[in-house]
């Protein structure tokens, strides 16, 4: 990690705000805790699993924490526990309690900070630019780690979109422009899901890196692309200037093939087009981005 844990001491605290209950969940008070006892639910973060922001007691000491309960298919709480136990960093969550029997769950201590989406707001003046180099360097720091971990689990996003999908989207001109299938050569430790929602900021520095459930040894360029491509509603990383600032920060600690990164970004954008059909503004942005990508590759 680029941020030295000692740099975080004395920084002002900023607490994340989370929504009220937005779907049916398990009752976290019925979970078989060992060293943690929840006292009050403070919020329900949006996530694939059931996640609760709570006030509670850890070995008798008052703490704020997050309880993650496996819900979605493919959830791997045990992988996250194994990885977090090796990191020992002030900017990664400390494990307070867990259980892998029955319905697996994990309790981690809260880290202070805000998401860049909150800090940058509408990002009218590219306020994001002053954060993106450290964002890129933080991911490069993860890629330098040498820890015990399994290969990342296969995901559809790793594979070139099917010709039928490209045809349905009228994107046939993109055929053949995606990276070759991933191999086991030159793998590095990858976060697996580092996007703006999983990184916190305080006093203009990274204060937290969250959600290591999908982490493991995998493809460096895909992990970078996953961090870079724009999600629906996101107001930053819309411009080439922002992307280059991120990559500039990444190159402070690591190297990458920028052309392959861009091809993986295109791959991810196609998959998001398939599911984000009702967000007209996002779809228009993605199609314009993909058209520019195709022109760069001499296809349009």
Located regions from the model:
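Juxta-kinase regulatory segment immediately upstream of eukaryotic protein kinase catalytic domains
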Residues: 2-40
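An alpha-helical support segment within catalytic cores of ATP-dependent transferases
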Residues: 20-33, 144-192, 196-204, 286, ...
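ATP-binding pocket architecture of kinase catalytic cores
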Residues: 41-150
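Protein kinase-like catalytic core scaffold
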Residues: 65, 91, 106, 188, ...
């Amino acid at each position: 990690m680029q941020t030295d844990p000692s740099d975080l001491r004395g920084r002002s605290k900023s607490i994340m705000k989370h929504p009220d209950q937005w779907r049916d969940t398990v009752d976290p008070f019925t979970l078989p805790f060992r060293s943690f006892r929840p006292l009050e639910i403070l919020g329900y973060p949006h996530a694939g699993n059931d996640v609760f922001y709570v006030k509670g007691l850890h070995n008798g000491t008052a703490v704020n924490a997050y309880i993650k309960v496996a819900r979605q298919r493919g959830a791997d709480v045990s992988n996250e526990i194994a990885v977090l136990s090796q990191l020992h960093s002030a900017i990664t969550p400390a494990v307070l309690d867990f259980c892998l029997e029955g319905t697996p769950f994990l309790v981690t201590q809260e880290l202070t900070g805000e998401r860049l989406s909150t800090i940058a707001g509408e990002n009218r003046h590219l306020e994001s630019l002053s954060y993106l180099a450290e964002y890129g360097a933080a991911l490069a720091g993860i890629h330098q780690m040498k820890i015990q971990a399994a290969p990342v689990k296969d995901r559809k996003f790793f594979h070139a979109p099917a010709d039928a999908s490209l045809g349905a989207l009228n994107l046939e001109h993109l055929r053949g422009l995606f990276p070759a299938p991933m191999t086991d050569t030159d793998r590095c430790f990858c976060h697996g899901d580092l996007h703006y929602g999983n990184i916190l900021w305080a006093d203009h520095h990274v204060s937290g890196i969250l959600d290591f459930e999908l982490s493991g040894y995998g493809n460096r360029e895909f992990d970078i692309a996953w961090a870079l491509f724009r999600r629906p509603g996101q107001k930053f990383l819309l411009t080439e200037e922002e992307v280059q600032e991120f990559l500039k920060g990444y190159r402070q600690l690591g190297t990458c093939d920028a052309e392959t990164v861009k091809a993986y970004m295109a791959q991810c954008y196609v998959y998001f087009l398939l599911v984000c059909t009702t967000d007209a503004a996002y779809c228009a942005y993605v199609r314009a981005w993909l058209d520019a990508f195709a022109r760069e590759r001499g296809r349009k």
